[in-house]
Amino acid sequence: MTTPEAPPSASRWLEPLLALIVAGGVVWAGYHWITEGFLPQPFFYEPFDIWADWFNTAYWARDPGTYDTWRTIYPPLSFVFLQMFGLEHCYPIATGTDPSAGLMARGCDWPGYVTLHAFFLINAVLVYRIYKKIDPRSAPWRAFALAAGLPMLDGLERGNLIIVSFTCLVLAYGPLLRSARLRWVFAGLAINFKVYLIAALFPLLLRRKWRWVEGALVATVMIYLLSYAWLGRGTPKEIVDNILSFNDQLGAAQLLDLWYATTYRALLSLLGSSNFPMMDIIGSRNVDLLLVLIPAIQYTVQASLIAAAVAIWLRPEVVPLYRVINIGLMLALITSEAGGYTQAYFIFFIFMERWKGFGIKWAIVAAYVLSIPLDIPLDRSLPVVRPAYFPNTTIIVNYYIMLGPFVRPLIVLTIAFAIACATLRTVWLDSRANGWRDRWRFAPDVTPRVTDAALDGQAAASADAR
């Protein structure tokens, strides 16, 4: 095993500094929770709703109205999983249609607590092992920023199944497992937990990994059928109908709805809404400008990712596999809003990149910035009284208009644009240097012919994967 080259001087001090800032944000969030009774912004603004995604989903895993009453977008696997790792008697079936009926189980279902936090710790160990395998020098800083950063902490506070799906994602696409079949299973599990993670699978076709994609799709279908047979509900039509309905409901009606997000969808909804006087606050000219400028930036970044995908198809052997996956994943995540915690997915792949080239360096630094659990207040709203779960009492909460909801989606877009441009540059340089003389190096994927060029391409891909 060769010793990795020493990282450039900027990386030696900058990454530890950024990780230290992330640690400071974690300490501040913990201090605020202890002294004020709730987590500060940018965490969710309802202090009583901690772990709500886990325990409400666990309740509806037992209520037959999962898809027609609660209108969930989760495939059956999520509910089967929560049935297996929860106490049945903690979830008596309630009358009515209370979407938060599972919150009462938080004081009873201790296996749920243990499972959620166990997967959180498992993720920390997995990402450290993966990054140590790639570059031991930067591994501690990147692993800490990802495992203890804002996206993962937000997922933990919400009790969202991103914590479990993330485990499946890193085992499917990280370098820890050697068995391709086992990787297929974890890829199928990840998709059955979070449907949009299919965007991490299809980019493998750009690298001509036909059998890998076929195996993962078969595993996905088999896992779905088994979980559907267990749960007894959750047909593809029900899931698709609920996803379409959910997308129609996304938006913002007040400034508090501009919370922790990955895209500008909520802001655009608020700008175009007649329920909130944004024109009176920033002026009609600025509103009209933002309604044109923000979509233009989004479309530009989406086009750059598509162009990068085309470039990968032409020169698949010169682009690292983790970046190929990330391009498809980021295209999905910037196109449809799925929550701020989903940033953990693409940050995982960004931190696999080497500290080389302006675009990649920017993406790495920006990923650290997204991991900082802090925000900058711009203005203050009136204090309100809210119930809190820790402590079990009512508290006075001061809400602020923060900078984060306006800046974080832009940082996400710059990361996507940076890796797209870095990919286009890599392909362009290879085309100028080598022309088309070795274009048959991937021919064995189509015909049973192995050439020296094909072997060279496979070796280069393996080196990139390491």
Residue ranges and their predicted role:
Residues 307-312, 340-356:
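Alpha-helical transmembrane segments in multipass membrane proteins, preferentially the mid-helix core
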Residues 2-182, 210-340, 399-400, 426-442:
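Primarily membrane-embedded glycan-assembly and transfer machineries that use lipid-linked glycans
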Residues 69-71, 169-175, 192-199, 245-249, ...:
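Juxtamembrane/interfacial segments around transmembrane helices
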Residues 161-170, 195-198, 215, 342-351, ...:
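Hydrophobic core segments of transmembrane alpha-helices in multi-pass, intramembrane catalytic enzymes
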Residues 181-205, 327-334:
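Membrane-interface alpha helices of multi-pass inner-membrane proteins
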Residues 87, 204, 351-352:
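Active-site catalytic microenvironments for nucleophilic, acid-base chemistry
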Residues 70-78, 350-457, 466:
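Aromatic-enriched
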